[in-house]
Amino acid sequence: MSDAAGLTTLAEMVRDRAKTRGDAIAFEFEGCTTTFAEFNIKTNRVGNGLKALGVKPHERIAYLGKNSDLYFELLLGAIKANVVMAPVNWRLAAPEVAFIVEDCKAAVLFVGPEFIALVRNILDRLPSVRAVITTERGAPECRDFTAWRDAQSTDDPDVAISPKDIAIQLYTSGTTGKPKGAMLSHANFFNLVQTGSDADKPDWNKWTPDDVSLVVMPVFHIGGSGWGIIGLYHGAKGVIAREFDPTKVLDFFEQAGITKLFMVPAAMQFVVRQPRARSVDFSRLKYMLYGASPIPAALLKECIEVFKCGFVQMYGMTETTGTIVALPPEDHVEGSERMRSAGKALPGVELAILDPDGKPLPPGEVGEIATRSGSNMAGYWNLPEATASTLRKDGWLRTGDAGTIDKDGYLYIHDRIKDMIISGGENIYPAEVESALCDHPDIAEAAVIGVPDDKWGEAVKAIVVMKPGKTASVTDIINFTRERIAGYKTPRSVDFIEALPRNPSGKILRRHLRDPYWAGRDRQVN
């Protein structure tokens, strides 16, 4: 169900699906269902409500909450008013949340019930926020979302929208430690989903009216919001999980008849290792799409045995609106060299391997992975220099990942040129963790690296140099850091060293610290 010829904006998509799939279920969340026709009306109300609050086209709103059907009402309702949604990672510490909300100059902050206390404590640091609306009752100082929405007109907001306008702003961590808002346009999303007719698509990329998609990755990730939008585009039913819980994921398979889903490998491991996983009926499951971090071969083999469906590895990033490379089910052959690859470029996506000067390298040589397609982001919000260093004038986006392309077009990822750590699908930059570590009164300097971890892919390891005559326990350092940054960024282990290795210019030689932990592995990511 993907006939959407002539549509150029996500607002048009919602209207079209209300006409063509009106009585079908768009979303199911914790026992409540919303049809496509109802979704169209609810998003009209949200768009009109934002207009009534004085939110102008191209302004931002923010959402701090877990997955819900209301989030997608907000996202698409804002889009109808040409307002940009900026979902916030709810795992972040209060200062990090405040930075994102104020960085995007959110006019309205929508907040889930679990985070009202956090918002109350940082509200004085959010001068741009004109209203706070809670998605569930229980906060007297906040407006109630349902009451606010239902008081609005059901008429279409009727706001002019261009395909080049920004639809969503997703924050991705920066090498300086400050998150960057990647601006994704309507055109970016349509380039992602409109990859030719169904006749030209591989089976794993085809959708039917009977498909049931599970939205289980957090909506502040492209794997959450983007996956939800893809399901809407195809007119499929989307079952929304409030947050990832492996036992509930198994319940969804049994009760909702899930046919497609996207998960990160760490989540797959939690699900497949559940005691009842081997007794669950997965017969309706057609394809499991996975990505955001590589998957250990042993885990993939176990998942294939248990889920008994087609597997598709996805490679992409927030800045490319998600997937640009896919390894299809037919290449998931145990012992095959291609199992080490990330797959081949999707239709309409160009790939290149560049040398340090930005010149293309021949097949088999290692360099920086670059990509060019209509899915490349519009840029980073209010960061022209960062945008220019990532997006070249000729349209090529430099990923910061190192890899090779073989003669058949398969992409092999070797390492990250940037120092980012991926733990359980979450992006973590060493500079941010190092900054928190160096606030410790007894630490002279610190370096942070990612080390192999069977559960999370990579785990954060801190390597610290103590000040002369000072000592601290591993537990003390970890607890100190946890008070300053999100829990998933906190080091899982700490090593002590007399001096950090540096090159003549004084730059820390992070590779020297990492190499002992990655010895004997094909690639320096896990």
How would you label these PLM feature ranges?
Residues 190-212, 220-259, 273-274:
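Conserved AMP-binding/adenylation subdomain of ANL enzymes
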